[in-house]
């Protein structure tokens, strides 16, 4: 029975496209309460980092994050695997190593059979096993739409933690996955994505960002984040604002997934692309329609955005090659300039 079910038809959003826009989220997070300060909380939500980081002594820190969303693909196992991979990415993006995870499941038990939920959980468990950790438990509720994700605990040496606020002018910018996930998954939700492209985007979303843990010990690695629902420009703007730098991006060097261009021409643009653009358009130089479609595209389980000092570029390229990870040079960071946009796109 579950083989004929299209999960994407049971949700109004898809993957990280479910995220609230950066502009609206800023309003939600405002508070009139006095802020409780814990000196052991090394990273909170002030700099839009990927996870919280807490000092536990002896030079070590616990990394804590959660991420969940509605179906981005139709297959339950693949949905669970992608959602789990996406949640684990926050730990890797901070430079940490995951320790364990617990599942978060919302499920319309009156609309879908329990075996579908079982396959979703199984996909999540598989991704955790690939990352070398256990899915230790979780919590489930009856919901109107399927929702799945993880709360993940990780660990890292404090000196290896990569913050959005630690990037420096002169750093080169690299991406570890091509863009276009939001475009292809929008085509899938509309029933227009070819089978080869379904497999291509699924495999990309299921790739763990373990390279983050391997790169973290390099002192020349100044900042790192994963590209998810706010698109490349949104997550890059978070680094630029937190670190008081500006960026120049070569849009022709930004790799896109094979086939994305044809789906852009067909109008397979997620609604979140425009919401993203409106949230940070004032920070970015003017964009062409194509640049907006690609650079503001909502990624689910996207790659890492890496800022690295020039003298270590060869090192990170060697590490990427050793583990078979993609690595694309897309731009550079500079000192702020009053006559320049926060992000210049060429």
Curated annotation (Swiss-Prot):
Q: Where does Mg(2+) bind?
A: 50, 90, 226
Keyword Transit peptide in record: no
State which Enzyme Commission number(s) the record gives: 2.7.9.3
Report the active site residues: 16
What reaction(s) does this enzyme catalyze? Answer: hydrogenselenide + ATP + H2O = selenophosphate + AMP + phosphate + 2 H(+)
Q: Does the keyword ATP-binding apply?
A: yes
InterPro entries in the record = PurM-like_C_dom, PurM-like_C_sf, PurM-like_N, PurM-like_N_sf, SelD_I, SPS/SelD
Which Gene Ontology cellular component terms are annotated? cytoplasm
Cofactor binding notes: Binds 1 Mg(2+) ion per monomer.
What UniProt keywords are attached to this protein's entry? ATP-binding, Kinase, Magnesium, Metal-binding, Nucleotide-binding, Selenium, Selenocysteine, Transferase
A single GO BP term for this record reads: selenocysteine biosynthetic process
EC class name = transferase
Functional description taken from the UniProt entry: Synthesizes selenophosphate from selenide and ATP.
Q: Which family does it belong to?
A: Belongs to the selenophosphate synthase 1 family. Class I subfamily.
- The protein depicted here goes by the name Selenide, water dikinase
Identify the species of origin: Haemophilus ducreyi (strain 35000HP / ATCC 700724)
Q: State which gene encodes it.
A: selD
């Amino acid at each position: 029975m579950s083989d004929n079910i299209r999960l994407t038809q049971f949700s109004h959003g898809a993957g990280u496209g479910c995220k609230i826009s950066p502009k609206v989220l800023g309003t939600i997070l405002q508070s009139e309460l006095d802020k409780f300060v814990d000196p052991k909380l090394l990273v909170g939500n002030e700099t839009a980092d990927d996870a919280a980081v807490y000092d536990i002594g002896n030079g070590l820190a616990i990394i804590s994050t959660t991420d969940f969303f509605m179906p981005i693909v139709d297959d339950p196992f693949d949905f669970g695997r992608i959602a789990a991979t996406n949640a684990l990415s926050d730990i890797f993006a901070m430079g940490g190593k995951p320790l364990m995870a617990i599942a978060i499941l919302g499920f319309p038990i009156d609309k879908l059979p329990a075996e579908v939920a079982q396959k979703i959980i199984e996909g999540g468990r598989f991704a955790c096993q690939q990352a070398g950790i256990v899915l230790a438990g979780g919590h489930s509720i009856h919901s109107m739409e399927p929702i799945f994700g993880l709360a993940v605990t990780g660990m890292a040496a404090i000196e290896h933690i990569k913050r959005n606020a630690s990037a420096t002018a002169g750093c080169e910018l690299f991406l570890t996955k091509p863009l276009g996930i939001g475009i292809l998954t929008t085509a899938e939700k509309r029933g227009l994505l070819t089978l080869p492209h379904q497999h291509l985007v699924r495999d990309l979303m299921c790739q763990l960002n373990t390279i983050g843990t391997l790169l973290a010990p390099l002192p020349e690695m100044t900042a790192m984040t994963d590209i998810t629902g706010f698109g490349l420009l949104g997550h890059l703007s978070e680094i630029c604002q937190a670190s008081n730098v500006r960026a120049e991006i070569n849009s022709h060097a930004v790799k896109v997934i094979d086939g994305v261009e044809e789906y852009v021409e067909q109008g397979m643009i997620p609604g979140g692309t425009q919401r993203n653009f409106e949230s940070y358009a004032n920070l970015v130089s003017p964009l062409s329609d194509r640049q907006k479609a690609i650079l503001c595209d909502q990624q689910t389980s996207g790659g890492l955005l890496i800022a690295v000092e020039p003298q270590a570029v060869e090192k990170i390229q060697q590490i990427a090659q050793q583990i078979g990870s993609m690595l694309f040079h897309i731009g550079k960071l500079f000192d702020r300039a009053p006559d320049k946009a926060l992000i210049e796109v060429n």
